[in-house]
């Protein structure tokens, strides 16, 4: 009988094989995209204020553009990507979000379905559409992408800045416990599950080249406020000439 780990490996390999024949190209040349962007990506662990930092940073970047005599162009996106993906796929947004949050459920019928062609075709289509939406946003530039594998997808664009928000497990657990109104043990379990799901989702977009990526800046959300993170990220964006 196949183990869960082996089934997961087979499932992932089948989806990646389908993506190859559907024409997805995940390997890019940095030289080809040297004039594209600028783009900032924010990857984060559970409880960390990714949306807040993105909003503050977009506002600060736009104020800089206005002060320099240019119209404001910066925006930030997160769940909008899932909405656009669901529209393009003609699927219920909840189905797309379910794919993002957990590519497996542990339910027996899902386990059986994971070996059917339609299951893998659907997942490959969702993965490709999300990839293409994020890639297009990154190429167009002046965008801050929160989560969704943005760092792995936009890794090769020279005019980019990749941020990672992290914190100790105890801090994240207490934060989620308060935000969700659940017990500390429940929050701890949720944090561990979500962080694992996010890591798997990011890894699903990695290539043999993007495996070499390191985040430009990592921030400890326990000891830094959203405003402080925004200020340091803004300085990094200036140093990298994104503004």
Which residues are covered by each model-predicted region?
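NTP-dependent small-molecule kinase module
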Residues: 4, 54, 132, 206-243
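Charged, amphipathic alpha-helical linker segments immediately N-terminal to NTP-binding catalytic cores
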Residues: 1-13
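Post-Walker A helix-loop "phosphate-sensing" segment adjacent to the P-loop in P-loop NTPases
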Residues: 60-69
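Glycine-rich phosphate-binding P-loop
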Residues: 42-57
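Conserved phosphate-donor/acceptor-positioning beta-strand/loop module used by diverse small-molecule
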Residues: 156-192
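ATP-dependent small-molecule kinase phosphotransfer cores
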Residues: 77-142
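Pre-Walker A (Motif I) flank of P-loop NTPase domains
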Residues: 35-40, 44, 141
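Small-molecule kinase domains that catalyze NTP-dependent phosphoryl transfer to phosphate-bearing small molecules
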Residues: 2, 16-30, 102, 106-109, ...
């Amino acid at each position: 009988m196949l183990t869960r780990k082996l089934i997961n490996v087979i499932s992932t390999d089948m989806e990646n094989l389908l993506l190859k024949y559907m024409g997805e190209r995940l390997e890019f040349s940095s030289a080809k995209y040297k004039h594209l962007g600028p783009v900032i990506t924010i990857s984060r662990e559970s409880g960390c204020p990714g949306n807040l930092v993105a909003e503050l940073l977009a506002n600060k970047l736009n104020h800089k553009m206005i002060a320099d005599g240019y119209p404001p162009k910066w925006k930030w996106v997160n769940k909008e990507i899932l909405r656009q993906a669901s529209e393009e796929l003609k699927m219920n947004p909840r189905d797309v979000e379910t794919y993002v949050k957990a590519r497996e459920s542990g339910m027996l019928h899902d386990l059986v379905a994971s070996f059917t062609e339609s299951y893998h075709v659907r997942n490959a289509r969702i993965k490709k559409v999300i990839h293409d939406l994020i890639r297009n946003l990154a190429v167009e530039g002046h965008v801050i992408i929160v989560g969704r594998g943005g760092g792995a997808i936009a890794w090769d664009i020279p005019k980019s800045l990749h941020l990672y928000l992290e914190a100790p497990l105890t801090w994240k657990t207490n934060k989620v416990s308060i935000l969700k109104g659940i017990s500390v043990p429940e929050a701890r379990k949720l944090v561990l599950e979500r962080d694992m799901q996010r890591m798997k989702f990011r890894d699903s977009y990695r290539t043999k080249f993007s495996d070499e990526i390191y985040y430009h800046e990592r921030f400890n959300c326990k000891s830094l406020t959203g405003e402080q993170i925004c200020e340091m990220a803004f300085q990094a964006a200036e140093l990298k000439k994104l503004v």
